[in-house]
Every structure is written in C-alpha cells, then in structure tokens.
C-alpha cells in the first residue's frame, strides 16, 4: 500500500511510506452501490442526482452505509460490509493482476474515471454535471468499475502498519474514503490517494461499494 513510484508526486505525505499488507480472500462489488439497489433495500433515495437508477447512491454518510448494510444482511442472510482500506486499495490496483497503473485500470485517467474536467458540462444544473451511471467507462484488471472517480467510496477503517488483514484502530474520530469523485481533480483519482472525514459527513460526492 501507499504511493509507489508510478503514483508520482503527492503533497499527501500520509500516502507514505509504502508498506506491505497481507490479505485473506474476499469479494468486492463490481460497481458502486446504485440508487436502484439502495431504494430496493431502504425504500427511499437520499441522492441529489436522480435522473438514472444506475447512478451511484450519494449523500450517504459512513453511518448511513452501516444502516444500509445491516438491512441488506437481514434481507439476504449474507455478511456484507464496507471494504477495509487495504482491501479497497488492493482491489483498485487490480489485485494480483495489477499492471501498476496510476489510476484504477489505466495511466490515462479519462479511460477509467469521471472527474471534474471529464464531466460533459461543468455548469451546475445542466446535463452531465454530477455523478454518472456506473460501469460506463473501462474497468480495471479485476473487472471493477469506477474505483477511480464518480463518487468517493467509504472504507470501514484505516491502517498504517505492516500487518495481516488490517482493519485500522477500533475507534477514532475520522473514517477513510477513497477513489476521488466527479467534483475533484484527477490527482484525487490516483489509487494511492487517501482522504478522511467525520463519519456523519454526507454530500453529493460520497458513496460506497460493498465487500463480503
């Protein structure tokens, strides 16, 4: 994990040092959770951009995601959860098939990410502004879509040391989110880029994907 050579310069020092983690097998969602799925589970849609059911759900806090996951698990009998940060970055990098790309699936950010300058229009209220339907750009090496861009993705926790199956501290003030969003620059779409905020934060750039 961390800012390996292909990531280039970053002012975000906490992407370093590069360190090794060991993960057990897990599953991660091919796409961000869509508004269609959220509505089916929760019965309402908190999102700001609602023109297409295949848009990622947004305006969801980390705590909202936990409520959704609890309800989904009751309905399905599964044990879905948010990915840990280590799981998220491993998947974004392409797992064991990684080609060491700067972004999730390419060194050309326009191939794989919806971000500020790639949105068809940057004027609020006009077509193309905001989130875009999932899986409309190229996937990464694992067949995962939008690991770079579209909406930020909440992680369960964070980690900083070499360890096996890191889940980060058991308590703290902030939660990690990764991947960049439609409202930010390509720099934020790098697979090593990290960010954090309060778990109560929600806006039209914040979404998530599931792990199992």
Language-model features, listed with the residues they occupy:
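A short glycine-rich, aromatic-capped structural motif
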Residues: 1-46, 148-149
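Functional-site microenvironments in short loops/helix caps that host divalent-cation chemistry
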Residues: 10, 48-51, 56-195, 204
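A generic secondary-structure signal marking the coil-to-beta-strand transition
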Residues: 17-19, 24-25, 130, 173, ...
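Carbohydrate-recognition loop of C-type lectin domains
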Residues: 197-199
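Short, structured beta-strand segments at or near domain termini in extracellular proteins/domains
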Residues: 202-212
């Amino acid at each position: 994990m961390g800012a390996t050579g292909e990531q280039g310069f970053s002012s975000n020092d906490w992407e370093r040092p590069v360190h090794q983690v060991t993960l057990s097998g897990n599953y991660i969602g091919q796409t961000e959770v869509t508004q269609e799925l959220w509505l089916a589970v929760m019965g309402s849609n908190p999102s700001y951009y609602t023109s297409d059911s295949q848009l990622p759900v947004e305006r969801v806090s980390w705590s909202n995601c936990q409520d959704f996951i609890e309800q989904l698990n009751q309905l399905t009998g599964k044990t879905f959860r948010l990915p840990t940060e280590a799981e998220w970055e491993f998947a974004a990098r392409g797992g064991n098939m990684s080609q060491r790309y700067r972004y999730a699936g390419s060194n050309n950010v326009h191939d794989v990410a919806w971000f500020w300058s790639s949105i068809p229009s940057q004027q609020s209220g006009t077509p193309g502004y905001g989130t875009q339907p999932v899986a409309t750009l190229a996937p990464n090496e694992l067949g995962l879509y939008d690991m770079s861009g579209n909406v930020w993705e909440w992680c369960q926790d964070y980690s900083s040391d070499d360890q096996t199956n890191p889940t980060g501290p058991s308590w703290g003030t902030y939660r990690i989110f990764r991947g960049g969003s439609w409202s930010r620059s390509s720099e934020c779409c790098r697979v090593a880029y990290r960010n954090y905020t309060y778990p109560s934060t929600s806006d039209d750039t914040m979404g998530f994907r599931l792990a199992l």
